Regions:
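N-terminal non-cleavable signal-anchor helices
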Residues: 4-5
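Cytosolic covalent-transfer regions centered on His/Cys nucleophiles
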Residues: 13-188
């Protein structure tokens, strides 16, 4: 079944019908849109300057370390505003999603591109008030524009699918270089 809408001229005459969408085409589009390894890849948003091997004791220290890396890589337009947005989001509900992973994020006006900073905490985990009660070892801090929700959801979806794989999480914790970390996201 195809969904259509009547189309009218400016003078009030009926022009005919306009095809809005065909469910088969819509389903195909959505599959392609969210397909693993499709047109968008997480590696597009990664930068070796934004991979941080952490040795911190608190959530605040981890957040600060990643924000410092973002600022050092000139990704932040307003460091205090970004920091505040990250903390404000964390107050709403913990970004500790479970499996030892946290995804703090902020979308602000004035940004043109998304970016992801990765924090890897080897050894003891970080208390993050995670949904499953686990301590955090992997942190993915996402930042970018507030007017591109679709792209943001794609990034979040791809990242979530990638980190669900336990072997990838184990490999991330064993990585010793930023290149190794970024290589683990090729094709994601």
């Amino acid at each position: 079944m195809t969904v259509v809408q009547e189309s009218w001229n400016f003078n009030g005459r009926k022009r005919g019908f306009r095809k809005l969408f065909d469910p088969k085409n819509l389903l195909r589009f959505l599959r392609q849109f969210f397909k693993k390894g499709g047109p968008m890849s997480l590696s597009e948003y990664l930068d070796d300057r934004l991979v941080v091997f952490l040795d911190v004791h608190s959530q605040g220290d981890a957040i600060e370390s990643l924000i410092e890396a973002l600022d050092g890589a000139h990704k932040l337009k307003d460091k205090p505003a970004f920091h505040k947005a990250i903390l404000d989001r964390e107050k709403i509900v913990s970004t500790g999603i479970g499996l030892g992973v946290a995804i703090p994020h902020a979308k602000l006006s004035g940004y043109e591109e998304f970016f992801i900073a990765i924090g890897i905490q080897c050894g003891r985990g970080i208390e993050w008030n995670s949904l499953d009660g686990s301590q955090v070892h992997l942190i993915f801090m996402i930042g970018g524009p507030d007017n591109r929700q679709t792209e943001y959801l794609k990034i979040l979806s791809r990242l979530t699918m990638a980190i669900k794989e336990s072997e990838r999480r184990k490999s991330l914790l064993k990585a010793t270089s930023a290149k190794q970390v970024i290589d683990l996201f090729k094709g994601c």
